[in-house]
Structures are given as structure tokens and as C-alpha cells.
Regions:
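Short glycine-enriched nucleophile-adjacent loop
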Residues: 231-243
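Alpha/beta-hydrolase active-site loop
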Residues: 117, 191-213
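Substrate-access "cap/lid" subdomains that shape
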Residues: 210, 244, 253-375, 410-428, ...
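Mobile gating loops/cap/lid regions near enzyme active sites that modulate substrate access
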Residues: 60, 419-544
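Non-catalytic accessory segments of hydrolases
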Residues: 24-195, 219, 361, 475-488, ...
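Active-site loop->helix "elbow" adjoining a glycine-rich segment at hydrolase catalytic centers
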Residues: 141, 196-200, 228-231
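Alpha/beta-hydrolase fold nucleophile elbow
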Residues: 215-227
Length: 544
């Protein structure tokens, strides 16, 4: 062999890592090091790592922002930025509701907090390979006040990326008072303050639009999906003009609880109350830039109840979860109310997948004594709400859910928190008619801890992300859980790819209409039912 030929081969071997390994070739579980998984963004090159064949990038800056101000593009960097570990999470208040059974199942990761939190994470099967994979952008739960992209093990995008040959993105953004304190009355510099938390998400979607092709994704085939508060964020983006065109499909999981955005004047009252609690004059508003988050949070705990009491005195009760931090109908970022015709028009061509779990915030997890109730105990408790219709209610439960076994099941079914909102949101989407809406309900019950978790809020995420192995404490990690996760994650991937969730192993899943009431019931044997719980919902609405 000629020396020149040998030299060229050696040169190729040396240069190959510099181009970022378009696909993983190593048999090692982890491949990391100089030249591994290198790709480009608008702001500079990033280096991730390869885990079990999937490219991981963590903590990539997508924006930067001063407190209470609109996000801006981050500064460019020289060289290759390491993107190997998660970035900071937005500051939130300490959690007070965690106990041993809940923490055992959920396995929270609180991360480290910093206002420098506008970072995102990417999982992809390949980079720089000219492929156009569907992109799935995950928005975490926690309302608009808490949570993060790393809070739960189920949020890890690697298995979903590998399962469906898709690119998965998750983001952190500003929350609570940092994301939604309306100071617009105090100067032009704060004109966007009421919704900067949502503006962060739009900035992340703009980053995806501009950069995801370098991560093997299709910038014109983006699905936003989120659970609980993340579902609320999805719903909000569907009504935000600045987000139009940045996503093509939407999934709302246990997040259909909003009926309207916060009124702008109410939001301004909260801003005024914050200044008053902190003994600041309007001319001193800039002092809020340097006050610690902890002190601001303490002030908010006084300001919010104060405004809520004022609204109550004015005959303006607060619906839903009470007065808190949420998107504001500010006339700029959100110029329309949630269900205005103009808001619905913005996303009329976006297919929607929407649903919730069977038991969500179940009574027996809040009050453990209910787990030991006899059938007579349950009837006594239900009579406080349903009176002489209690027997009718229990009969309707058995019709809708024939696998009802435990007496506590009658008290744990979600008929108020999310399920009515799912139907309300699906009906509004179906009426628009331009793009389909598909409905589901997650009814699978966890066997862990004597079955105490049932179909608890958040459990479905483990299945949609194909993350049973990461969520064994919540799911048990049994064969049935793995089988259902395979079907559900494929349905989510198919929806992201085509706007249709039908998948192998599932019965035919028709689009929802108000007339057919079609919903996929996810259990060990998934089945499509029609107006499955209509009678139950009617009873619940009539007996609040």
C-alpha cells in the first residue's frame, strides 16, 4: 500500500470525530470526549455525548433575559461549548406536600436554582445526517409556578427519541412571579412582564425553528406537548400570535383546566399589591431587580390573598385553583381571551391530542383513611354530595368502569379537575373543524404500594415517554406496564409525525366529535368508547 494512501486513511480516522459522529458507531454505553457529538447552533458549536446510541445535549442556552423583561438571543460563544449536564431550574418555592409514599413514587429531582435558567435539552438518534425527524418539544408541569424539565425521571427524552426516531426537546423557563408579575403600569421597560414566562417558551420554539435541523430534526414538523401546567402552556401557545407557525401539532395531557386567561387589570392589581407589601413607591419599581427571590416570594404570599379578598368583596370570585401566577390577557402577547374566535382561529389547522387520567388528584391519596373505607363508608361519604342519587352515581361508575373493584374507586374518579375541561377543549377544537382532535383517558392502575397510586396525576408520562424502566417505583416495572408503554409511546410518536395517533396494537382510534364522543381508554387492553362517562359527568355537574 502506498504511503500516501495510508496517510489519507489515517487522516480520515483522525478527522472523523471532528464532524460529530452523525450516527453512533461505538458499542460502549457512553461515548463522550473531544470531537464527540459536536454540532452547530446559531450561537456556536455544542458538544454532547452519546448514551446507548442516542445523542444527548443538555443545558444549551436558547435565550437570556433580565428580570421581568422579554427574553433575548444569547451571546455567541467561541469554540465548542460543553452541553453534558442539565442547566439550572427557575427558582421556585419549597415544596410542602411531599411525603414518603408520594416521593417514593415520583422520585423528584429539584435540581439547582438560578434565574439564569433559559436552557434546553435535546435527545436525537442522529446529527448532521440530513434526516428530517419529527420534533417533540416537552413543556413540564407544575402549573405556571413550579416544576422544571428535570423534575421527574419520566421527563427524560432518550427512550422516546430512540423508540420513534424523533428528536425530543425539553426546556426550562421563568415561572411564578419571575415569569408573570405584571409591572407594565410602571414603565415601558416592563411592558412585557406579565407574560415573559410564556415568551421564554416562544423563544425556545424559535431556537428549535432555527437550529433543530443540525440535530437531525425537521423544523417544519414540531409537536408541542405538555402535562398538567405543561398542558396549560400548550393551550396558551395555541392562542398566542407570536407562536403561530412554530409548531404544527399539539398534545395536552391532564392540562385542560383553563377557562380564561387572567384579566389584565387584575394582574396589574397584583403588581401594585407587591409594591405595597414591599413598601415601595411606583418610582422605586426598579428596586425589584435586586431584591432576592425569597423576599419577593414572601411578599407574593401576602399580595395574592390581598387581591383575592378585594376581588371577592367586589363580587368577582376566583375560579379554578385560586388566584396565582398564570398567563395574562395583556392585549399584546395574548390579545385574545382563551376561547375567543380569534384565538381559536390561530391554531385551527393544528391537530390536537387531548386527555387526562382516570383518578388524577384522587381523594384516597389526599386522605389515606379512604383507602380502608367499606362500601357503606363510601356511600355515606358520597351522600353528602349526591344525596338520593348516590346509588345512581355508583351504578353509572360501574357502567363506565366495569373494572371498579375497591370501594375507594368510587371516590377517586376525576369528574371535576381535568376531565370536564378535556371535553370542553375537544368540543371547541372539533367545532373549528379544520384539523382533527383525538381524545384519550389513561385508566391503567399501578400495582405499587398495594395499588394506592391507581391512575394518579403524572403517571401517564412514564408511558408516553416509554420510560417504565426509569419509573419502576411508580409503575412496578411489570410486563403489562412495558406493553402499554410501547403502544402509547408509539401513538404519541405517530401523532407527532402525521397528526394521527393510530398505532399497531391499538384498536382503530377515530377522531373525536361532540356527536361521537370517541375516546381511547388506555388500560392493559386499550379500547375505544363513546360518551363513556357522560352520565357521570352530568351527575357531577348537577351535584357540586
Amino acid at each position: 500500500m502506498k504511503k500516501s494512501s495510508i496517510f489519507l486513511r489515517l487522516l480520515a480516522l483522525c478527522l472523523w470525530p471532528m464532524f460529530g459522529y452523525s450516527q453512533s458507531k461505538s458499542g460502549d454505553a457512553i461515548v463522550a470526549g473531544d470531537g464527540v457529538a459536536v454540532t452547530s447552533t446559531d450561537n456556536g458549536q455544542v458538544r454532547g455525548y452519546i448514551h446507548n446510541g442516542t445523542f444527548n445535549y443538555k443545558g444549551i442556552p436558547y435565550a437570556t433575559a433580565k428580570r421581568f423583561m422579554a427574553p433575548e438571543k444569547p451571546a455567541a460563544w467561541q469554540g465548542i461549548r460543553q452541553s453534558l449536564v442539565y442547566g439550572a431550574v427557575c427558582p421556585i418555592d419549597p415544596t410542602t406536600t411531599v411525603n414518603d409514599p408520594i416521593e417514593f413514587a415520583f422520585q423528584h429531582n429539584w435540581g439547582y436554582m438560578s434565574e439564569d435558567c433559559l436552557k434546553l435539552n435535546v435527545w436525537t438518534p442522529g446529527i448532521n445526517d440530513q434526516k428530517k425527524r419529527p420534533v417533540m418539544v416537552w413543556l413540564h408541569g407544575g402549573g405556571f409556578s413550579a416544576g422544571s424539565a428535570i423534575e421527574l425521571p419520566s421527563y427524560d427524552g432518550e427512550n422516546l427519541s430512540k423508540k420513534g426516531d424523533v428528536v425530543v426537546v425539553s426546556i426550562n423557563h421563568r415561572l411564578n412571579l419571575l415569569g408573570f408579575l405584571n409591572l407594565s403600569a410602571y414603565g415601558d421597560k416592563y411592558k412585557s412582564s406579565a407574560n415573559v414566562g410564556m415568551m421564554d417558551i416562544v423563544s425556545a420554539l424559535q431556537w428549535v425553528k432555527q437550529n433543530i435541523a443540525n440535530f437531525g430534526g425537521d423544523p417544519d414538523n414540531v409537536t408541542i406537548f405538555g402535562q398538567s401546567g405543561g398542558g396549560g402552556k400548550v393551550t396558551t401557545l395555541m392562542a398566542a400570535p407570536s407562536a403561530k407557525g412554530l409548531f404544527q401539532k399539539a398534545i395536552v395531557q391532564s392540562g385542560s383546566y383553563q377557562t380564561k386567561f387572567m384579566d389584565n387589570e387584575v394582574s396589574k392589581k397584583i403588581g401594585a399589591a407587591m409594591l405595597e407589601v414591599l413598601n415601595l413607591q411606583p418610582s422605586q419599581v426598579d428596586s425589584l431587580q435586586t431584591i432576592s427571590y425569597e423576599r419577593l416570594s414572601a411578599a407574593a404570599k401576602k399580595a395574592l390573598p390581598k387581591v383575592a379578598a378585594q376581588l371577592k368583596a367586589e363580587g368577582k370570585p376566583i375560579a379554578g385553583f385560586g388566584l396565582g401566577w398564570e398567563p395574562v390577557n395583556d392585549g399584546v402577547f395574548l390579545p385574545y381571551q382563551l376561547n375567543d374566535a380569534a384565538a381559536l382561529e390561530l391554531s385551527k389547522n393544528v391537530p390536537l391530542l387531548v386527555g387526562s387520567t382516570k383518578t388524577e388528584f384522587m381523594a384516597s391519596l389526599i386522605n389515606p383513611a379512604i383507602r380502608n373505607y367499606s362500601l357503606d363508608d363510601v356511600k355515606t361519604a358520597l351522600k353528602k354530595r349526591y344525596g338520593d342519587k348516590t346509588d345512581t352515581y355508583m351504578a353509572e361508575v360501574l357502567k363506565a368502569y366495569p373494572n371498579t373493584v375497591k370501594p375507594s374507586d368510587y371516590m377517586d374518579i376525576d369528574l371535576a379537575t381535568f376531565r370536564p375541561g378535556v371535553i370542553r377543549q375537544a368540543n371547541a377544537k372539533a367545532v373549528a373543524g379544520a384539523a382533527p382532535v383525538y381524545m384519550y383517558q389513561f385508566a391503567w392502575a399501578s400495582p405499587v404500594n398495594d395499588g394506592m397510586y391507581k391512575s394518579v396525576h403524572c403517571i401517564d408520562i412514564c408511558f408516553e415517554f416509554n420510560n417504565i424502566a426509569r419509573c419502576e417505583e411508580m409503575t412496578g416495572g411489570g410486563k403489562e406496564a412495558y406493553a402499554l408503554a410501547g403502544k402509547m409511546s408509539q401513538a404519541w410518536v405517530n401523532f407527532a409525525g402525521t397528526g394521527n395517533p393510530n398505532a399497531k396494537g391499538l384498536p382503530n382510534w377515530p377522531a373525536y366529535t361532540a356527536d361521537n364522543g370517541a375516546a381511547m381508554i388506555f388500560d392493559n387492553q386499550p379500547v375505544v368508547k363513546y360518551h363513556n362517562d357522560a352520565a357521570l359527568l352530568k351527575l357531577a355537574a348537577e351535584n357540586k
